Amino acid sequence: MMDPIPNQSITAWPWPDELDAVTAAPDSHRILLENAHVRVLEILIPPGHREPMHTHRWPSVMLIDVSAAIRYYQADGQTSDYPRRAANAQLPHIGWLEAEGLHAVENRDSVAYHAIRIEIKGR
């Protein structure tokens, strides 16, 4: 049986620990559970708030339960805008994310953005 979770070499991670989301953007990232296998983060970005640049070292499952219009900033200065999910959209929105390099998120909405991120360690 194939492993559905792609492997990632932790030794190849190019960013320092100081840029980890919990350290670099502690106002929007709170650890709910951490062990040798997973780290579960609560992500809360208030309206009008822009997080500091940070990283997520491990691939993860993201569950967005309160959507908001956000702007995603990449390290190279490129931005991407994402609208708030429609009122009739099914929430939570669940997706797979690979490890994320240096980035920041800005909440450009009047509601707080809220998500749970389950990071898979050692992958």
Where are these regions (language model features)?
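Glycine- and acidic-residue-biased ligand/ion/polar-headgroup-sensing regions
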Residues: 56-78
